[in-house]
Amino acid sequence: MGLNATSQDWQNHISLYFPDVRLKSYVEIRNHDAQNTLMTLSIPAFWKGIMYNSDAMDEINKILSNYEYEDFMNLRKDSPIQGIQSKLKHIVIIDLIKEFFDISYYSLRENKKSEEKYLEPVYEYIALKRVPADNLIEEFNRKIS
């Protein structure tokens, strides 16, 4: 009556799974798919500010070295429920996000290419302690009420 799955179907299926980290010869960052137009350049600019500046990388490393593996696993467990109000040990994650964006901002500004402007849409969300999903949730709730 129906179709039976083949081993090739299974191979296709598992090729669509994107874990947080995959072993490759390069760094693949997949945490920001499908952002709105204003945010599209914010995330690559953020990563450029961090990854292309050894002082920025050292600063991030210094901050993150204060945490243990278990702290990150707790954050991973809590963040789908609590979002940016989740805590990494005792710090609310939105405060850590702001600190990271500040590091990236100053790094980009040092380059004198005016690329720090691409971080502005994220700073607007940070100031409001919101994320783009909050807008979608509000719109959805308006439509169903």
Predicted regions, residues:
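C-terminal accessory/tail domains of diverse enzymes
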Residues: 1-145
